[in-house]
Amino acid sequence: MKFVLFPLDPVHDVALKMLNRELVRKGHQVILLPPDTKMEEVVEMCQKEMPDFIMVSRTVGYGAAELLARFIDMLDAAGLRDRCKVVVGGKAITKELATELGYDAGFGERTSWDEVIAYVEGREVEKEKLKVKKSKRDITQGYTYQILDPAFKQLLDKITDQILDWAKDRTSPAVERAKIKEKVLEGEDLIEEYLKLCDETIVSYFKKNLLPKKVRLITREERKKFDQLVKSLNFDGRILRHTLDKPLVFVQYGTGCPFMDAMHIKVSEAWGADGVLHFDPSWGARCEGLLEGLLAHEEDGSIITLENLKLIRSSLDVSTLWCVRAHRGLNTPETILLAARAGADLTKINMVYGSLNGGTDPERLTVDGVYALKLAARYNLPFDIPTNEELGGVPAPKAFAGMLVVAHLGVKLNAKPILKPLFCYSPDVMINDYMKDNYIDYNVAKVIALRQIMDAPIWPGEPIGFMTHTEDRIQSAMTTALHAALASSLRLDAITIASTDEAYARGAITVSARIDTLRAIAEAFRFFGQAKIEPTKRAEEYAQMIVNGIYETLEKVAKREDFVASLYEGLFGTREEGANPGRAGRGTVRKC
């Protein structure tokens, strides 16, 4: 076929040059005219050449409709309109505008060359070829979980063996509730036994139908409308990473309303998020027992119930990874159970952070954590280990020592840990000027240190860039994107990001703020591609300092020969550093 390509533009003809390449490659005859060719000249040439297609491009928006209308009229007057197909494309073009002006077809921004070639060749566009294909990924694949330094392995073995020996004949209300709930889910009627182990808030809900403050039931009609809405949503998701397959990008949700959560998730999926994390209300961590049913909550945090989790799960794309947080409260084992039954892919367990900065008693959370790790192994739920005690001021070496203990403990119980250091501007960093020059070196040092000790996936959180964000949306998106680029440069497995209004939110988190950061990250990944960010020599110095600090902490804990006592006594972080052993659940552990 013969084509005349005409840039109806003073200077811009890049798109037509690219189209020329595609058409020539397909064996077509092409006449490419230069920019600023007069319409009269084009008409005269077309009368001589009699092309099958006249293809016009218009990049500049002003005056586009008038110029394009005039050109189609000139072709009509010359008798070419019925003999040639006339197609228009460019940033200023929409399909509706092309039809209105009398063109045979119009192609706007984001059109692929496959679509254009398919049109001129008279065939259907291969939709599957054009559609972005995402698949669910296993973050833990390819890792051995080997402790790479024998000296560290000796210490970690001693500490974790002591934990397992100590916990083997101890139980708690949470452990017993999880055992009961498992039987209830299999059909046994044990609600009375369950409620004997619950706080009055939970008992009143089941026996008196009294809802906790600011909690309401979701109606059947609301559920029906939700299902209809989710089914009606149809979009082609995006892939944020440019030429790399790491890191996966996770967003946090927990608006209080499962419906709102689902909509935030769908928007995040549409803009490229690979996974989502469920955050529950803070009061849920301090309440013995869990509620049931479809429930909405007026404040931050979405209530953990099997029904709520299943509702949210029903809204997820098949490729989206789903993590349910369970690591810091009085319902850790049961949360793992419900997450697994609802179809979660991942969970979150860290007894050290949960007891030093999460408000739960160390003895209680150690017992609960060991049982939770067993459940995670049984249900094949990889678990991440956030070192959020860093945000309270605990130095990274001590926080990492705790993380590695929990990771090695998980491996011994056949679970799959994911290391989660913080990419943050923590109090310890501020006090010691570790980031006085840049945010790169100390964060890189954390990764270098962990990779020297254990072969395990690394997923910085939560979110990356914490304490570097401000209320300015542009600044917030920028700092998140730069931290994401650093994670990409380090070839890390995943990252958790915040929306631009999340770190300093004084109200509801908005969907547009989620898009801010996802778009910024996509641009950062595109900008760097396979290129890497180069730290200064201080990164290696900091890394060695962190490794030494981890070893010293583990050595003290191993010598103490009592993990729980080490938590109480400040070996994983002192009160002066920001570690405050929790009180929730104190005195509830018993021998069994």
Regions found by a protein language model. Name each.
Residues 1-5:
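Conserved hydrophobic helix-helix packing surfaces used for dimerization/oligomerization
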Residues 9-10, 14, 460-489, 493, ...:
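Active-site-adjacent loop and "lid" segments of alpha/beta metabolic enzymes
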Residues 17-20, 24-104, 110:
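Cofactor-cradling patches in redox/metallo enzymes
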Residues 24, 68-81, 237-241, 302-317, ...:
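Surface-exposed amphipathic alpha-helices with a cationic face
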Residues 30-33, 53, 105-108, 276-277, ...:
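Short hydrophobic alpha-helical runs that function as membrane-insertion/retention elements
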Residues 60-64, 106, 128, 138-429, ...:
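Catalytic alpha/beta active-site cores
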Residues 118-128, 360-369, 500-526:
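C-terminal helical cap(s) of enzyme catalytic domains, especially alpha/beta-barrels
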Residues 127-137, 158-162, 166-171, 175-177, ...:
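Long, compositionally biased intrinsically disordered regions
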